[in-house]
């Protein structure tokens, strides 16, 4: 598969263009049942190496999102992806950006899951429980307020 993002004379990318191009490629790979694929890293005007890396990871992780846990037991599609042609001097920075982007995408997926849950499953108490669980799993602190705490902050 080859994705051409812009005409050569318009070689200035927006991050969202790259995310969408990668996501389309991932969706096509899923249709074709391809589990291993490569993405050729191309430096573009307007995006730094970290921005390009982040966009690639977001496109990969978010393309396969579906909230269908009540419909079937289908697994989330996530192929093995290799990024080729990256500048050697930027590899360490890219590794760091890949992990950051994975964490970002996981947070986006969690938010999408929470928004898509029906109200008889996700009500204030269960939302608080899930927030605490996410905090423990990801290493951040969660403070759950009761109604009295909330009223104190409204003054």
PLM regions and their residue ranges:
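Short amphipathic alpha-helical segment within the helicase RecA-like ATPase core
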Residues: 1-155
